[in-house]
């Protein structure tokens, strides 16, 4: 819904900032010296010098653009963002993240496919990608609540 409401770039930026804020929270960053890894004066000093990096696969830094916007969470240490066109070809970390994201999404689509309201879309077979059967199901049944309405569905 956020993608349809805000646009893909802004929604991706806010989602990335949510993930970064959650990772920093789990590490105790920004929570004071009593939390997480910030339990000693040495670790507190290290946190003051801590740098967070992010590599985006593509030319657009949607993370920095979303930083400090109304919808973005507070992020104690914003990421230093590097954009790499075709990053999955040149960086093992980006390639690994791309595989993990695709496998995770495909598994999620199979779980959705098991629910009766999504059966017509055959997501167990096409994982939501624009196969002919998937497009025909959208024409026949209309988009589901999970479809991005801003995307060219048919």
Go through each PLM region and give its residues.
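RNase H-like, Mg2+-dependent phosphodiesterase core
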Residues: 1-154
